[in-house]
């Protein structure tokens, strides 16, 4: 477990060197809060949920048929295999998803998106070691893509490895500053590590970026509400 001070850092003096290989949780919070801005996200009325769900299922069936036809016509096109595998993933058919995604990695061993999607499937199956291996390969092939580092952070959090989670998530935040998902996951690491105040700051920032972020809002409610609104 990482022990952290809950004292607010002097954000004007904190700067994380690019050559650092690991970061403290306090530094992670400071970096995010320095660049935090608030924007208003668009939402959907609750009554539309069931309509959109039905529409989505119909669209996925059409998408599946489309990419199956493309793969049948040109079985050695890696991109089509990835699209087909990802569609199976969205439908919850992980066996077929992995089959086509792994074929894509064999067709093109340098195709980062293929490895990323393999990682997504393994993550859903809670095969975390295999997922980390896939995301790590994707990150090496596409080092500027924040998504691979974010997913590694998600898995490290699930495993209780908060130190490695913070390192991976800080890298994700470097590549895409201001991602509500990344900020939320660093908040998870903070909360699980015992830094409740830091977690509240991070969850508050995530909700400021995305007011419809349910998990972050639930986390804030659990910790006593948004940071700065205690009184």
Language-model-detected regions and their locations in the chain:
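Long, contiguous interaction/recruitment modules in multidomain scaffold/adaptor proteins
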Residues: 2-73
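Structural signature of tandem alpha-helical TPR/SEL1-like repeats
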Residues: 56-69, 91-103, 113, 124-137, ...
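Structural marker of alpha-solenoid helical repeat scaffolds
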Residues: 73, 107, 141-142, 175-176, ...
């Amino acid at each position: 477990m990482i022990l952290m001070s809950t004292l607010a850092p002097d954000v004007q003096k904190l700067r994380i060197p690019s050559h650092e290989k690991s970061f403290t949780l306090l530094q992670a919070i400071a970096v995010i809060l320095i660049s935090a801005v608030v924007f208003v996200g668009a939402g959907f009325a609750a009554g539309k949920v069931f309509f959109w769900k039905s529409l989505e299922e119909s669209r996925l069936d059409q998408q599946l048929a489309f990419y199956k036809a493309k793969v049948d016509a040109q079985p050695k096109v890696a991109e089509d295999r990835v699209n087909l595998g990802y569609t199976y993933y969205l439908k919850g058919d992980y066996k077929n998803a992995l089959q086509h995604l792994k074929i894509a990695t064999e067709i093109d061993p340098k195709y980062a998106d293929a490895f990323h999607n393999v990682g997504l499937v393994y993550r859903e199956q809670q095969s975390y070691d295999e997922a980390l291996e896939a995301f790590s390969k994707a990150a090496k092939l596409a080092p500027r893509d924040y998504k691979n580092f974010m997913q590694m952070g998600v898995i490290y959090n699930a495993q209780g490895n908060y130190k490695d989670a913070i390192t991976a998530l800080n890298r994700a935040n470097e590549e895409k500053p201001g991602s509500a998902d990344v900020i939320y996951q660093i908040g998870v690491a903070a909360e699980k590590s015992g830094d409740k105040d830091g977690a509240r700051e991070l969850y508050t920032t995530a909700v400021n970026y995305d007011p419809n972020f349910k998990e972050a809002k639930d986390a804030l409610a659990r910790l006593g509400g948004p940071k700065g609104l205690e009184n």
